[in-house]
């Protein structure tokens, strides 16, 4: 049985390379991102990690297709550079919403299924 993996933020950078590497290893990789279209590295499902309903629907779609989820790679995120005194507070809140709460939303949607399965790491 091939492992079923979700990679968030899988259409660019580290997420894209992670999806490609896992696909090469024989995994069925689903990537969640805000983009309308995905890449050749994984099965694309449009889902913004800042939207709990989109995340829940995306997880349900993977489960409907595969019946299980083996691994979740929480990769969605972005950085802000520069001195803190020049950092826009709203942009910092958005970063925290994507980078931290996005991971929380994905894990809350996936972990109950993994617990029922009796296995499945979240990275």
Predicted regions and their residues:
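A hydrophobic alpha-helix adjacent to the NAD(P)-binding/active-site core of NAD(P)-dependent oxidoreductases
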Residues: 44, 87, 95-96
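A glycine-rich helix->loop->beta "capping" turn
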Residues: 61-74, 80
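Conserved glycine-rich cofactor-binding loop
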Residues: 11-12
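The beta1-alpha1 cofactor-binding region of Rossmann-like NAD(H)/NADP(H)-dependent oxidoreductases
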Residues: 47-57, 89
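Hydrophobic positions on the long internal alpha-helix
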Residues: 73, 106-110
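Conserved glycine-rich Rossmann-like NAD(P)H-binding loop of the short-chain dehydrogenase/reductase
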Residues: 20, 25-40
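Substrate-binding pocket helix/loop in short-chain dehydrogenase/reductase
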Residues: 83-84, 91-93
